């Protein structure tokens, strides 16, 4: 059977299925906690959720209490899946340099399938929300989103030999991520309204089945595995040694300039991801609360509005990369995020909340550009190692960020629900400061492209 080097459909299906369930899970938890706490159903209408605005009303106090409980529950759920997925992402993505990229795509898909089956059962049989911790832990054991994206980006990097093409291809994946997650978010409200929780989770499960079949039987690997490797597979101990030695050699044998650049770029990536993930993750809870009081359909509209940010960020990367260095594109993206998140902190009407997306039009640009900058500074044989580091940082940073911001939101929602957004904007000063230092030194974007050819030429001279 002829196989194809087309990973985009895999990413499309996985992101759609995951984004379809993500806002639905938050609403499912919100409603289940309400039922468990007050032995009644959370009320909603066609236009707005039942959201008490009178602060002296007992219902208002009850809603704030459920907001806090939901926030803490989400934090605990994220931590449950983060620890195993952190280890698995590091091992599988780094091993992709020698063992192939398909493992890092198919295993997270299997984990997501198991998690969605659990969600379907919990919803259908009205099991307690505590069962969700088991589903999240199992999903983490299969690598979760970090392993999938790490493998996907490494797969793309393997096919790119031109530096500008690499930046654009990586930006395309982030575009797919944003557009598809927006479309899934938009449709999630209608899925939930027309089909309910159970069939929404079942639909996501079927999508993951399709993905597993495509990856297994139709997707060609970009890493050639020799017949000797297939006949004499490495032991578990040798696998671990190969994994950690690859990442260790990435930093140990590299010139000091390259090593410092990698560390600095990873730090910028990590700090920006921390602020952006943390602030953005609170949107659903913020929109459910008064004075917005959005329903599942409006929450879907809000998620779909994120699509425009992904599209404009991709166009920004495509156009700006023709006339600006990568580092300036990162600057523009961070300032764009700051403008949007500050506006969200004071958004008290539905119109204003939708308009938050306008100043945020380029806020996603730093993510693909920083990935591309890191990919450019390493050798082709080190792509898996660097994307393994990125994947682990994404899991670690994302989990800590979600946990920290959920705790802060729970502690501040009663007196100012927008405080967490202002904190997120303030923390952006950290990556901005490091970028300014990087810009003031001689290590600008042009140096990134010069380091790899020097190493390649030195390796070639040794081989000859």
UniProtKB/Swiss-Prot annotation:
Keywords: Glycoprotein, Lysosome, Membrane, Signal, Symport, Transmembrane, Transmembrane helix, Transport. The chain crosses the membrane at residues 72-92, 105-125, 131-151, 172-192, 199-219, 260-280, 297-317, 327-347, 350-370, 385-405, 419-439. The keyword Glycoprotein applies. It is a multi-pass membrane protein. It catalyses: estrone 3-sulfate(out) + n H(+)(out) = estrone 3-sulfate(in) + n H(+)(in); 25-hydroxyvitamin D3 sulfate(out) + n H(+)(out) = 25-hydroxyvitamin D3 sulfate(in) + n H(+)(in); cholate(out) + n H(+)(out) = cholate(in) + n H(+)(in); glycocholate(out) + n H(+)(out) = glycocholate(in) + n H(+)(in). Lysosomal proton-coupled steroid conjugate and bile acid transporter. Preferentially recognizes lipophilic steroid conjugates or bile acis as endogenous substrates and seems to mediate escape from lysosomes to the cytoplasm. Modulates hepatic cytosolic copper homeostasis, maybe acting as a lysosomal copper transporter and sequestering copper ions in the lysosome. This is Lysosomal proton-coupled steroid conjugate and bile acid symporter SLC46A3. The lineage of its organism: Eukaryota, Metazoa, Chordata, Craniata, Vertebrata. The gene is SLC46A3.
